[in-house]
Structure formats: structure tokens, C-alpha cells
């Protein structure tokens, strides 16, 4: 559906959708005198916004202007360093009030996007700076700090424990911030395991390893909690240690975060788990030699993404929560003491502009620029996974050949899908003037970007929206296809059509991922694009052409290149991107996403991942073994989520090895970047 009202140009596509649909997807089922209805309950929740102010404006001026209107209920998060970014909680009025709010957004803000709702702050009238946590433990901070933003932190597992001089054990996990908004502390004899964060973020709970004596009263640390679940004869009861604290992600034998954390900071590095690399023979047994690198003894700060966020596999929620997670990790870094902070983020969307200008990408650029190791601040490095969408048919590319031109393709939605599905169409702003995007259902009902669709509607196309300083995008959505009492969208082949494409202009389209994240049971299914003309005329011959480990798809609108994780398309010295390769032959892992980024205004364009790391031992033995949620357990995680922590571990050492099989052709550089690195 075209937007139902004129929005400020800074409003992002998903904020617009939420307003147009009256925040339907954030609503709660309520009952009043037997009448059932859905409402966004502002007594329990606030909108959570990720804001970028204009270059000639300041966050402080925008904050002051919004706070002058009590009806907006604005609650700003801590300042994001000296950058142009801010996080903000507010009532719906703050983004719908035409008289006062909308003019302020137009005056001050360059971009604003919506994350999943959050509870109101406990202290709405006062804003705090980031709380300095660096000196609040029993031991002083070190020169190195590792941060992980993930799901599942097995802090009591043996690979993350160290032996004290007293003979006891202590976890190397300095702190965990669990972002689940309804998490409650466990109280034992008047002391709490898990503390709120009222002085800065004010949602979720944090769990510290230990506390300085002046701060320890009434608090139970991670080491204390481990001690409560340990006996000299039987060791640590990890099952009850996690279950009694409500760490639901650790109820499973496997967890995404447990694997990533072991690869990055475990005591047995990946090079000791795999057979010898050249000139050795990979078929020989691994050495199992304990690590002597800095990561094997480093302290870790872990941010646990909330269950609500992890259930939404699209990654639309990511920017605000990831930004605050990075701020939390940095709050443990001490000026002039902590020299390096390395943060691993293995999540990311398949959507976005893919030219380095997605809002979270530009925020990461600003943070690594500010935290560059000068002025007493640590050097910040962020390591990202390249993504796993190379073969998911989630990227369409079309270039106009005549004036004007048009293109159409199929968006295939499975039956019984339980979640809202999104796709995005992107073009350069200068080429978008005459573009019309149309979505047609399997039964023939059409929705257009220039026609307002009455509400409620099972599908729609948003009006053209400024996606960045250089781009225009159109949001395409289809509601769940599972049978329910409400409005049900058709499953099957929907058609997306783009008309008015200028000569030589490029159209890019991306499907938002919906298949569930690890251990998340949502009933969601993956949708994907199909080029019907290519399928009818060329797919048979293409299925007989197998080159460099891939079946040919030449001539198809579906492009495998240009599929990098939507957070991983900027070219920054402090932001690193890791793809995967197969140890057997050194080729890119079949699923590992490839570059290049779309062309944009940035001076440097990302061509591919920085490097590729071992992600599969062979084509039959996919994945890489690393730790599960209990001591001694291992499992194979398949995907570039296993590559990012390997590259991060090399970044910790600040000295990368010489890559093998360095690519020279543009196509191979887009796939494997600087070449194949041996595991750390």
C-alpha cells in the first residue's frame, strides 16, 4: 500500500509501515467486558527508535526540543559518543503528532527507524551518561576486552574458566547483559543474582562476574552463582546453574552464541580442532593443543539479544539494540588502560541498501572512527559475518536497456507461514522519479506504490522512501499465509513488477529473511525470488553446467553476487567481514555470501569479504566443530557465523597470517576477498 499520509523524509520504511497499520504487529490481545480487541499498550511499552540527526544539528538540540513536549513521553538513551546517533523511547504521539512532532523530525533528523518495542524507563525525567563499569569488579581491567553480541553464553563451561591461586575457579566472562525486557533477578537470602541497569539503558538485567567490596552488598556475581552450584566432589552442576537463573537459551545442548564464543575466546583454538593445514595433511588427526594466544585468556563481555528480537529473523530490529550493546561493552573499557576492544556480531539482515549506507553501518563507521586508539580511548574493531544468502535466491538485479524499461519476477511465499514477509526494491534516487512498483497476488489482486490500499489489507507496496543520502527504496509486504481468524494472505507466486526504469539504471531487490534463528520455534518459512522466464528457457541447460563448484545461472535476474549481510557492505579499516571456505579444496563455502556492494557515494566500495575462513571441512562434512552449552560438548555450526569469530581471533593478535590461494580475478575477489586464511 502506498503510504496513507505524507511522512517526513527521515522516517524509515518500517516506521512508516507501523504507523500506517496502527502498530498492529506490536499490539496486544486484550478483553474488556467480553469484547476482544488489539491495542498497542503504552502503559507497558514504548516505541524504540534509532535516530541519526542531520550534520548541521546536534543530538542535544533534538533531545531538548522533543523533551519540551511532555505528551511525547520521550526518553533518550545515553549519548553514542560524539556521533550524530541516538536511541529514543517514546509514545506513539511522538511520531504521529502533526502540529508539534512532525516539524521537529523534519528540522533535526536525517534518518529514524523503528526497532521492536521496549518497556518505559523507570526514570523518565532524567537522562544519564553511560555508566562506567570498568573499575567495579574485584580485579582491574586489562588491556584487551572481547565483546560478543549473540544468543547463549555458557559462562560456567570449562573453556571459559580460569583457576585462581586459591584453587577455586572464576569465569572469564566479566559481564552479561540480558536484553530480555521482562527478565527478573533471582533472590537468595536477600541477595540478587542479576541487577537492573537504571543508570543508562534501563531494561533487561546484567550479571557481573564479581563486585568491588564497596558494591558487593546484596549482589550475587557469576562466580558466586557458579559456587552455589558446585561441589568439590562433583564439580559444577551446569544444568541447574543455567536453569535456576532463567537462561533459557542454555536449556538446549546447542546455542549459536556458545559456538561463536568458543571459536573466538575458547581455550582450544580452531587450529587445534582441525587436521593440519598445508604443508601438512588435513586427514591427519587434530592436535588438541591448548591456545597460547591472547584470546584464550581474555575477558569477555556478552550481550544476550532478547527472545523477541531473535524470533524476528529479518534483522529489522537490530540497529538500536546492537548499538546499545556496543555501548555496554565499551562501558567496561578503561581510558588509558584498555587498548583494544574487539566485538563480534554474527547477525545481520539480508535487506538494506548494500552500499555501506545502512543506518547501523554508518553508526559503526562513526564509532570505530571515534574509538581509534588515540586520546586514551581503546581501538575498537567490529567483526561481522558475510552472510549465508549466496544460494537463497533473495537478490534480484536488473539494468534498464531501453527508455523506459520494465521488469517483473516472482516472489514465492510458502503456505502456513506465520510471520509478515518483507521485500525491498532499491534504486538510485536520481533514477526513481517515474518508478512504479506493483505487487500482484496469485489470484490477480494488485497493490501499487502510487495507490493507497484500504486497511486492513493482506499485502501492499510502500511509497518511495529515501533509503539513504543516495538511494530510494520501496517496501513490499505480505501478511502471514497461515490460516487464522484474521486476514490471511494468499500463498504461492506473487508477482513484483517495476516500471519506468530509465536506460542504464539498476534495480536491486532483496527478500527479508524469515526462516527461524537457531533454537527459535516460530513456524516461519523462507520466501524467495524466482525468474520465471529464465526457469522456462535456460534452467535446464544451466543445470548441466557446473563450474568452480556452482551450477550456472547466467542470464537470470537472480544474482548470487551482491548478497553480503546488509550490515557488512561498508569498507572501513575498523570493520572486518569474514566469509567461509571449504577446507577440502579452498573454494568458497556454497552458502557464503559474496560482494560487491552496490555503487554509492562512499569513496571506497567493498568488493567482497576481507578474507574467508574455514567453515566446512568438506562438502559432505559441513560446518565447524566448537563448543556447545556444556563443558566438553561440541557441535557443528554451518554458516559464516563460524567465520567471523575466527577472523576476530586473528584481529585480537593484530597480526594476520599470509593468506593462501589469493584470488586475482574480480569474480573470485568478490567471493573470497583477500584469500583463504588458516584458522587461528
Stretches with model-predicted labels:
Residues 2-146, 151-172, 565, 573-574:
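Autoinhibitory propeptides
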Residues 7-10, 153-262, 272-293, 445, ...:
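Active-site core segment of subtilase-fold serine proteases
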Residues 147, 152-158, 173-177, 181, ...:
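Catalytic-core segments of hydrolase enzymes
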Amino acid at each position: 500500500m502506498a503510504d496513507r499520509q505524507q511522512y517526513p523524509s527521515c522516517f524509515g520504511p518500517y516506521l512508516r509501515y507501523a504507523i500506517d497499520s496502527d502498530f498492529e504487529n506490536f499490539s496486544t490481545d486484550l478483553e474488556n467486558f467480553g469484547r476482544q480487541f488489539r491495542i498497542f499498550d503504552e502503559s507497558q511499552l514504548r516505541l524504540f527508535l534509532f535516530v541519526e540527526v542531520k550534520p548541521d544539528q546536534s543530538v542535544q538540540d533534538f533531545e531538548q526540543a522533543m523533551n519540551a513536549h511532555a505528551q511525547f513521553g520521550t526518553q533518550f538513551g545515553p549519548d553514542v559518543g560524539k556521533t550524530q546517533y541516538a536511541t529514543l523511547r517514546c509514545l506513539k504521539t511522538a511520531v504521529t503528532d502533526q502540529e508539534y512532532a512532525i516539524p521537529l523530525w523534519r528540522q533535526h533528523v536525517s534518518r529514524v527507524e523503528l526497532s521492536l518495542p521496549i518497556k518505559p524507563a523507570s526514570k523518565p525525567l532524567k537522562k544519564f551518561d553511560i555508566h562506567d563499569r570498568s573499575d567495579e569488579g574485584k580485579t582491574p581491567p586489562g588491556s584487551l576486552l572481547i565483546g560478543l553480541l549473540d544468543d547463549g553464553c555458557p559462562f560456567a563451561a570449562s573453556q571459559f574458566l580460569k583457576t585462581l591461586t586459591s584453587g577455586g575457579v572464576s569465569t572469564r566472562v566479566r559481564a552479561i547483559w540480558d536484553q530480555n525486557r521482562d527478565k527478573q533477578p533471582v533472590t537468595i537470602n536477600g541477595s540478587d543474582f542479576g541487577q537492573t541497569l537504571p543508570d543508562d539503558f534501563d531494561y533487561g538485567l546484567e550479571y557481573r562476574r564479581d563486585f568491588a567490596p564497596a558494591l558487593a552488598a546484596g549482589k550475587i556475581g557469576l562466580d558466586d552463582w557458579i559456587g552455589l552450584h558446585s561441589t568439590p566432589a562433583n564439580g559444577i552442576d551446569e544444568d541447574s546453574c543455567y536453569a535456576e537463573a532463567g537462561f533459557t537459551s542454555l536449556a538446549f545442548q546447542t546455542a549459536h552464541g556458545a559456538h561463536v564464543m568458543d571459536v573466538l575466546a575458547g581455550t582450544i583454538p580452531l587450529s587445534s580442532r582441525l587436521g593440519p593445514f598445508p604443508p601438512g595433511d588435513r586427514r591427519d588427526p587434530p592436535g588438541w593443543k591448548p591456545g597460547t594466544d591472547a584470546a584464550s585468556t581474555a575477558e569477555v563481555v556478552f550481550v544476550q539479544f532478547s527472545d523477541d528480537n531473535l524470533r524476528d529473523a529479518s534483522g529489522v530490529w537490530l540497529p538500536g539494540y546492537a548499538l546499545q550493546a556496543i555501548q555496554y561493552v565499551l562501558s567496561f573499557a578503561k581510558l588509558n588502560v584498555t587498548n583494544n576492544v574487539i566485538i563480534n556480531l554474527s547477525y545481520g539482515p539480508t535487506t538494506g541498501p548494500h552500499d555501506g549506507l545502512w543506518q547501523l553501518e554508518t553508526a559503526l563507521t562513526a564509532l570505530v572512527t571515534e574509538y581509534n586508539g588515540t586520546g586514551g580511548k581503546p581501538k575498537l574493531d567490529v567483526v561481522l559475518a558475510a552472510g549465508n544468502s549466496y544460494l537463497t535466491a533473495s537478490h534480484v538485479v536488473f539494468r534498464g536497456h531501453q527508455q523506459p524499461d520494465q521488469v517483473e519476477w516472482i516472489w514465492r511465499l510458502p503456505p502456513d507461514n506465520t510471520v509478515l514477509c518483507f521485500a525491498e526494491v532499491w534504486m538510485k534516487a536520481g533514477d526513481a522519479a517515474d518508478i512504479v512498483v506493483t505487487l500482484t497476488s496469485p489470484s490477480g489482486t494488485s497493490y501499487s506504490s502510487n495507490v493507497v490500499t484500504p486497511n486492513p489489507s493482506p499485502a501492499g507496496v510502500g511509497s518511495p522512501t529515501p533509503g539513504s543520502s543516495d538511494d530510494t527504496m520501496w517496501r513490499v509486504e505480505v501478511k502471514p499465509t497461515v490460516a487464522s481468524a484474521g486476514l490471511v494472505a494468499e500463498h504461492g507466486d506473487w508477482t513484483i513488477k517495476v516500471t519506468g526504469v530509465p536506460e542504464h539504471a539498476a534495480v536491486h531487490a532483496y527478500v527479508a529473511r524469515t526462516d527461524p534463528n537457531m533454537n527459535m520455534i516460530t513456524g516461519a518459512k523462507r520466501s524467495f525470488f524466482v525468474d520465471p522466464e529464465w526457469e522456462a528457457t535456460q534452467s535446464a541447460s544451466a543445470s548441466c553446467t557446473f563450474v568452480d563448484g556452482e551450477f550456472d545461472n547466467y542470464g537470470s535476474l537472480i544474482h548470487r553476487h551482491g548478497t553480503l549481510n546488509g550490515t557488512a557492505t561498508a569498507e572501513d579499516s575498523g570493520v572486518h567481514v569474514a566469509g567461509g571456505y571449504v577446507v577440502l579444496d579452498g573454494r568458497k563455502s556454497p552458502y557464503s555470501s559474496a560482494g560487491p556492494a552496490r555503487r554509492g557515494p562512499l569513496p571506497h566500495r567493498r568488493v567482497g569479504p576481507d578474507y574467508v575462513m574455514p567453515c566446512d571441512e568438506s562438502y559432505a562434512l559441513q560446518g565447524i566443530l566448537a563448543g556447545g552449552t556444556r563443558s566438553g560438548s561440541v557441535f557443528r555450526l554451518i554458516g559464516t557465523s563460524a567465520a567471523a569469530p575466527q577472523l576476530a581471533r586473528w584481529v585480537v593478535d593484530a597480526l594476520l597470517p599470509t593468506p593462501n590461494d589469493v584470488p586475482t580475478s574480480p569474480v573470485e575477489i568478490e567471493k573470497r576477498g583477500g584469500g583463504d586464511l588458516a584458522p587461528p
